[in-house]
Amino acid sequence: GSHGGATAEGQLQILKDYGITEEAMGCPIKSSMETVQIGLSGVRHQPVFMDKNASEADGIILFNRIKPHTSFRGPYESGLMKMMAIGLGKQKGAESIHHQSPAIMHELIEEYGRTFIDNVPIIGGIAVIENAYDETYLIKGLTPQEIITEEPKLKELSYKTIAHILFDKCDVLVVDKIGKNISGDGMDPNISGRFVLPQYCSGGIQAEKCVILDITDETHGNAQGVGLAEVTTRRLVNRMKLEMTYPTGVTNTFLHLMKIPMIMDNDREALQLALCCCPEAEDQNNMKMIRIPDTAHIEYIEISEGLLPLAKENPNIEILTEPYDLPFDENGNLF
């Protein structure tokens, strides 16, 4: 798709971050944004594009996580079908899908994916499902036809294995870091509750205000998803690279993902602002706040004392410490 700033060099860097290099793999890695048309989609007769290098291969093996998508619901969400329709399509292919109505996204993923299976030498796919601890739960090899029949079943299984914050709602959700290496939207809305298109998706915790403190190193300045928060920090904005962030928005058309929220000078001020702007809070003197490292790692989270009674009632929650003050440094930051 358009990852890596929609450049060949940027996509090579993403692979390098995952330890995938020519030296490590013992084979060439070809990266290009050039595409060729492989046919027309079966129902809407739209042109379907594919990476030119991949089109010249004798065979293609797909690999992707199967997981709930962040923007739509359907038989095929994030997985092997999407890896063909959007991933192998590079930016041009991704744009051709995203520039159509989000209401039919699930139909387009299947339609374009089937076009690949019918026109390209797909050998098969390797589907991976992760558990709530960001660990591999299942690895399954699929033939091209099994991708069509089995991926929907694997998607349903993935809904049962993903992580959840074990509270229905809070006043303020604090996310230390977002990034494309965490989720396509920077943070997974199936956990944060902050959906790009809430008219099509729901789930996750319901927070009146959301604060995002920083971006990951691995996202290389791509701050997509920061627009889903109400408050952020100057640190994040200083690390944000528009040339990495904006191409993703142009490709997926969700420009509000790139909007910059209110900027505070440090973490303390960001939290203070969010906490004082929650008119729906049940108790203004005992606010319910949750802090998570990112949406891929929520085994250990911090909660304010306002949530302690609910935590004690939940047998799935273990309270590890007594209440303590957040460890702000001399600059008012948490890290």
Annotate each predicted stretch with a short phrase.
Residues 2-4, 179-181, 218:
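Short active-site-proximal "capping" loops at secondary-structure junctions
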Residues 50-179, 205:
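Conserved, well-structured core segments that form the ligand-binding/active-site neighborhood
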Residues 1, 5-11, 40-43, 71-76, ...:
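Short acidic, glycine/serine/threonine-rich loops at helix termini
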Residues 3-30, 147-157, 277:
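Alpha/propeptide regions of enzymes that mature by internal proteolysis
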Residues 189-335:
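C-terminal non-catalytic interaction/assembly regions of soluble proteins
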Residues 32-34, 63-66, 126-131, 157, ...:
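Fold-independent oxyanion-binding glycine-rich loops
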Residues 15, 19, 120, 141-144, ...:
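Short, electropositive alpha-helical surface patch
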Residues 10-75:
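An acidic, phosphate/nucleotide-engaging active-site surface
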